[in-house]
Curated annotation (Swiss-Prot):
Disorder this protein is connected to according to its UniProt record: Mitochondrial myopathy with lactic acidosis: An autosomal recessive disorder characterized by progressive muscle weakness, hypotonia, seizures, poor weight gain, lactic acidosis, and elevated serum pyruvate concentration. Some patients manifest growth failure and moderate neural deafness.
Membrane topology: Single-pass membrane protein
Pathway where this protein functions: Phospholipid metabolism
Phylogenetic lineage: Eukaryota, Metazoa, Chordata, Craniata, Vertebrata
UniProt region (Disordered), positions on chain: 219-275, 317-343
Protein name listed in UniProt: Calcium-independent phospholipase A2-gamma
The encoding gene: PNPLA8
GO biological process terms, semicolon-separated: arachidonate metabolic process; arachidonate secretion; cardiolipin metabolic process; fatty acid metabolic process; intracellular signal transduction; linoleic acid metabolic process; lipid homeostasis; phosphatidylcholine catabolic process
Sites carrying sugar chains: N4, N361
Motif GXGXXG: chain residues: 449-454
InterPro entries, per database record: Acyl_Trfase/lysoPLipase, PNPLA8-like, PNPLA_dom
Its job: Calcium-independent and membrane-bound phospholipase, that catalyzes the esterolytic cleavage of fatty acids from glycerophospholipids to yield free fatty acids and lysophospholipids, hence regulating membrane physical properties and the release of lipid second messengers and growth factors. Hydrolyzes phosphatidylethanolamine, phosphatidylcholine and probably phosphatidylinositol with a possible preference for the former.
Pfam families: Patatin
Length: 782
């Protein structure tokens, strides 16, 4: 449909008009870069028109701001648009309109042919508008018209303002002014076409500048256009569906359609590159201000107007979705964790089952291979293989016992081959089989810890050996020691060293280990919490004891059961005692104390003697060992428990507990308080106390069963004393104590010298044959 527009003075294509708001009789019309205009609808003539009233303006020197009642312009002149007639069939002034339109058409055709080649392509690039509301919204100044063109247009408007007010007809019905808001990234080449004046010289100058600037920034804006194309297209389509109106085919002009009361216009944002003087927009204005504001990207637009809203909206929506998804995610995470734990548990259980089955099968195979062997040399090899297997996997001992390995080993021990007998004794001790005790009952030797004060215990043992005329390892069935007592137990029980040699070695160890410069020791104390060199002590132990395992000492038939006690400090909250044994417990018998027989002898001594402050703690496997005296400085009770595990049906005959001397001061502290040093000293003394265990055992055991030898010293001698005169003083005080308790020593020697009765010997023989042939000897081969 063609529209005839009667133009009085000029045609002004409105581009960035934001709103036209007013009342029924006196309405206000707001245009870009224009002051406030009052207009009213005339009911005198059939051709309805609007007439301007007195121009009222408020000026500002900087940017333009528009609000509900005012409009500011950087110019000093008013801008007035007079439209005489908007009709499709008005005959008045038709000739004049045709002349003006022909000129406009020819000009646009020439420009479009010069740039694009045809008019249709130019029209497709013109800014399009979309009807959104019934009020034309106000926009801020965008700087799309040069100052020179604005002044010329204002002069022309003032000149013909009166004429346009008298001649301009307008339809009687109320017009609904509609606004279109488009994104800044959708600008086309001729989006300023709606603002071209009728002075074609100026228009051509304006268009040429705009075209040049457009192609200069085309590369810069191409990426932005591609990114925003799809979003703007979807927004335009959504608005079309909501409002139910078609897009106007002629953007940039005011058109009146028959049967419609809407006047459509375009709200096209200006180009930032075309106009250099772009004015800032107030942050309090509507969203259209920011959509029309030139910007180089979406981030600037969002940061300028809705920068505070978008993060909040995004956060709110995200938080709502997270709140909804949080329980599900939590349940899923919990279920996943449970499933993972269950899978891990089942996997570990399956691995344990497979490992246990494989261990049992391996044990059975070794036992059967040993039973099929007849060659003595090959038997030694088979026995050693089974021994190594049981050392690595102690849980296989039960399977070996079920396969009746003990009777076969006892029969092998009858063969006159020392190497084979030694190998058999070792594996029997590892399985937990024990020979009968030496005397009428179990004889236990327990030695306390105390450093170099162990020479006092040596004096007591010297007296016992003198009275019994037997070495120490033949007098006792079980020897247990802590710290320095463990050293004596190993030297006497495992290495069978004479007492004189032990005393000499004791003095040498004291001079080699406990000779340390005070300054160097203090530095080491602050660094490793050890005053003395622990590495030197380890090297001495390796040289003296070698690399033999504890269980290998069971090869000697005269070797008693020996144990060294240490303290594990990294298992749980409370420290725990650990027993280094040269034997194993029978399957099904569990000791109250941790321990093992697969360790080396020097490792046992090193762990048991790691006194805090003197030597560094010793890491062995996954355990951290310290001095056993921290828990059990008197290991008599532990020795009794271990013996009951080895010989459950044999009574106790004698327990000899040797101390390293004690010092009792007559000085009494004040009644009111004690010093911090005294408090700490009391804690240490209570931890290393030996007399409380003595009092308990002395009251519980039968008479003439428990004997304690611990002399009282006249001087408090430290455990790291290495001076010979002090060691001689300790030795002398030990001898004096023995002289005062000579009757007690004779009683102990008498008990230790008793032999087994004939009935006990017969019982031992019957038990041996029963174990050897799996039945009574009367029904077996003797």
């Amino acid at each position: 449909m063609s529209i005839n527009l009667t133009v009085d003075i000029y045609i002004y294509l409105l581009s960035n008009a934001r709103s036209v708001c007013g009342k029924q009789r006196s309405k206000q019309l707001y245009f870009l870069f224009s002051p406030k205009h009052y207009w009213r609808i005339s009911h005198i003539s059939l051709q309805r028109g609007f007439h301007t009233n007195i121009i009222r303006c408020k000026w500002t020197k900087s940017e333009a701001h528009s609000c509900s009642k005012h409009c500011y312009s950087p110019s000093n002149h008013g801008l007035h648009i007079g439209i005489l007639k908007l009709s499709t069939s008005a005959p008045k002034g038709l000739t004049k309109v045709n002349i003006c339109m022909s000129r406009i058409k020819s000009t646009l055709n020439s420009v479009s042919k010069a740039v694009f080649g045809n008019q249709n392509e130019m029209i497709s690039r013109l800014a399009q508008f979309k009807p959104s509301s019934q009020i034309l919204r106000k926009v801020s100044d965008s700087g799309w018209l040069k100052q020179k063109n604005i002044k010329q247009a204002i002069k022309s408007l003032k000149k013909y303002s009166d004429k346009s007010a008298e001649k301009s007809p307008f339809p009687e019905e109320k017009s609904h002014i509609i606004d279109k808001e488009e994104d800044i990234g959708k600008r086309s080449l001729f989006h300023y076409t709606s603002s071209i004046t009728t002075k074609f010289g100026d228009s051509f100058y304006f268009l040429s500048n705009h075209i040049n600037s457009y192609f200069k920034r085309k590369e810069k804006m191409s990426q932005q256009k591609e990114n925003e194309h799809f979003r703007d297209k979807s927004e335009l389509e959504d608005k079309k569906v909501e409002e139910g109106k078609l897009r106007s085919p002629d953007p940039g002009i005011l058109a009146y359609k028959p049967g419609s009361e809407s006047v459509h216009t375009v709200d096209k944002p200006t180009s930032p590159s075309a106009i250099p003087d772009v004015l800032q927009v107030s942050t309090k204005q509507s969203i259209a201000n920011f959509l029309s504001r030139p910007t180089e990207g979406v981030q600037a637009l969002v940061g300028g107007y809705i920068g505070g809203l978008v993060p909040k909206l995004k956060y709110d929506s995200k938080s709502q979705s997270e709140e909804q998804e949080e329980p599900a995610k939590t349940d899923q995470a919990v279920s996943k964790d449970r499933n993972a734990e269950e899978k891990k548990r089942l996997s570990l259980q399956r691995e344990k089952i497979i490992a246990r089955v494989s261990i049992d099968n391996r044990t059975r195979a070794l036992v059967q291979a040993l039973r099929r062997t007849t060659d003595p040399k090959l038997c030694i090899t088979r026995v050693e293989e089974l021994t190594f297997h049981l050392l690595e996997f102690p849980e296989g001992k039960g399977v070996a016992v079920k396969e009746r390995i003990i009777p076969y080993l006892l029969r092998l021990r009858q063969i006159k081959d020392e190497t084979l007998q030694a190998a058999v004794r070792e594996i029997l001790a590892l399985i937990g089989y024990v020979d009968p005790v030496k005397g009428r009952g179990i004889r236990i030797l327990s030695i306390d810890g105390g450093g170099t004060r162990g020479v006092v215990a040596l004096q007591t043992l010297r007296k016992l050996v003198e009275l019994t005329q037997k070495p120490v390892h033949q007098l006792f069935d079980y020897i247990c020691g802590v710290s320095t007592g463990a050293i004596l137990a190993f030297m006497l029980g495992l290495f069978h060293m004479p007492l004189d040699e032990c005393e000499e070695l004791y003095r040498k160890l004291g001079s080699d280990v406990f000779s340390q410069n005070v300054i160097v020791g203090t530095v080491k104390m602050s660094w490793s919490h050890a005053f003395y060199d622990s590495q030197t002590w380890e090297n001495i132990l390796k040289d003296r004891m070698g690399s033999a395992l504890m269980i290998e000492t069971a090869r000697n038939p005269t070797c008693p059961k020996v144990a060294a006690v240490s303290t594990i400090v990294n298992r749980g909250i409370t420290p725990k005692a650990f027993v280094f044994r040269n034997y194993g417990h029978f399957p099904g018998i569990n000791s109250h104390y941790l321990g093992g027989c697969q360790y080396k002898m020097w490792q046992a001594i090193r762990a048991s003697s790691a006194a805090p402050g003197y030597f560094a703690e010793y890491a062995l496997g996954n355990d951290l060992h310290q001095d056993g005296g921290l828990l059990l400085n008197n290991p008599s009770a532990l020795a009794m428990h271990e013996c009951k595990c080895l010989w459950p049906d044999v009574p106790l005959e004698c327990i000899v507990s040797l101390g390293t001397g004690r010092y009792e001061s007559d000085v009494r502290n004040t009644v009111t308080y004690t010093s911090l040093k005294t408090k700490l000293s009391n804690v240490i003394n209570s931890a290393t106390d030996t007399e409380e265990v003595h009092i308990m055992l002395d009251g519980l055991l039968p008479p003439d069963t428990y004997f304690r030898f611990n002399p009282v010293m006249c001087e408090n001698i430290p455990l790291d004393e290495s001076r010979n005169e002090k060691l001689d003083q300790l030795q002398l005080e030990g001898l004096k104590y023995i002289e005062r308790n000579e009757q007690k020593m004779k009683k102990v020697a008498k008990i230790l010298s008793q032999e087994k009765t004939t009935l006990q010997k017969i019982n031992d023989w019957i038990k041996l044959k029963t174990d050897m042939y799996e039945g009574l000897p009367f029904f077996s081969k003797l």
